[in-house]
């Protein structure tokens, strides 16, 4: 009985995570840039990202914070190939700012990536966030 209860909780959590990812999918960015920003779709994606980039996004409660909408995780990718982990961003929707931005092994991304994140994606995401919040009000 406990296994069934745990499975129901896990499924409910995954459903909540997916609903949050869907709600904020408008903050994804794929315009005229070498880079794209995509939102994490599942806790499993966070684990994969953390393992491949050798940092802590797959552990330490980031999935819980995401499900509670405290912070959102976006993956910064190069357009080609878009599925290879590159840089991970933790974004606060309430404060509209980037909390963390790390490449492999918690290293600081290069200037081109930082410029994309701070000067291109962040203003874009904040503008889109206002639209999401207005439509929810």
Task: Annotate each language-model stretch with its function.
Residues 1-137:
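Catalytic-core elements of nucleic-acid end-processing and repair enzymes
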